[in-house]
């Protein structure tokens, strides 16, 4: 990863690897920007900024990946700007962008072809529920609520497996 900013957004932007949208590989800002030839970056940035996702802002971008999806092709999309790391939730932002793109471009957006019967996205998300919810038109807020519930359940269940006490400074609600 080229920068700290890339690392901050990666937990939510890596989900685009399971779609036909470029996650910015082959550019100087992988995972900080997403796009494809079919996206209108101005329109998408407007929709995403209207969601008021905590700690995030979006701007339209153009890029041409040197490798990866759409290598050598002009892509339009958005760049994620983290305004406040203390409230930024990478997974929430990723889900918000996915839901917006799926809603805006239902005929063009695609999940990558399943590998051995399992969608690549499902491997990244750890479940097929997120993909199915996005396909059903579930809002970004509802996706985040469900993910947060599952995260809390996991954090409770893992307690008996921890070898060391959890440091008080670790924010387990992040990502």
Language model feature labels by segment:
Residues 35-145:
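Conserved functional hotspot residues or short segments at active or partner-binding sites
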């Amino acid at each position: 990863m080229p920068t700290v900013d890339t690392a901050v957004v990666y937990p939510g932007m890596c989900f685009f690897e399971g779609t036909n949208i470029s996650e910015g590989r082959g550019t100087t800002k992988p995972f900080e920007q997403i796009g494809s030839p079919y996206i209108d970056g101005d329109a998408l940035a407007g929709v995403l900024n209207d969601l008021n996702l905590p700690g995030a802002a979006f701007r339209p971008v153009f890029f041409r990946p040197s490798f990866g999806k759409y290598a050598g092709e002009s892509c339009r999309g958005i760049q994620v700007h983290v305004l406040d790391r203390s409230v930024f939730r990478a997974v929430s932002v990723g889900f918000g962008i996915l839901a917006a793109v799926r809603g805006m471009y239902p005929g063009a957006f695609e999940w990558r072809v399943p590998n051995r019967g399992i969608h690549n996205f499902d491997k990244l998300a750890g479940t097929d529920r997120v993909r199915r919810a996005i396909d059903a038109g579930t809002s970004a807020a509802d996706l985040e609520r469900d993910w947060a519930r599952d995260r809390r359940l996991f954090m409770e269940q893992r307690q008996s497996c921890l070898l060391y006490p959890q440091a008080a400074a670790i924010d387990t609600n992040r990502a």
